[in-house]
Amino acid sequence: LTEAQAGAAKIVHVAADGTETVLKDGVSFPAGTVVDTTFMSAKALDKFLAEQIEETKKDGTLFSLHMKATMMKVSDPIIFGHAVREYLKPVFDTYGDELKAAGVNPNAGIGDMMERIKDNAEITQAVKDAMDARPPMYMVNSDKGITNLHVPSDVIIDASMPALIRAGGKGWGPDNKEHDTNCVIPDNSYAPVYEESINYFKETGALDPTTSGTVQNIGLMAQ
């Protein structure tokens, strides 16, 4: 932005019928700022997640979702919530009103959800039945039953994907054993990077740490 363009801005959602909703106001852009925007279709996201869950089930692999909810605090918890809702679709379709009344927000994960419905045996059982019918999940802690979708910030893509790649595409399952894993990354910045990395290692083999050296992570923080 030039000096003349610098100043406050707002983010506005314009609906198909022309209705405008201000999502955020007073966003400050000093001169020299590079501004970029993007959007994601919730319908396309849900369709993609449903397809990936189905493919994972068919392939007999673990389902895993890799996001960065610690940094992308607005977008990634919402995307995570869509994954929770899609994975437990029969539960949300059947008990939507009861879950809403209990204060369940899928963006907070399955762990928070289970805590809020712990006194409702019927819904608790429905969740277990739905999970049994879905592909097994990549686990954060197999011993404690903490899944990839329990807490949005438990699986951070910068750490989880390198670990999975290093393990040959295998992750920990609910049975406390390693299994081939479907890594779902609904992010067109991250996904191509890891896809290219995986293809490279398929061609060249694993890195030899004695000759490849190290790369320091300095920690670039976005505003």
Mark where each language-model region is.
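Extended, well-ordered protein cores
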Residues: 1-81, 90-223
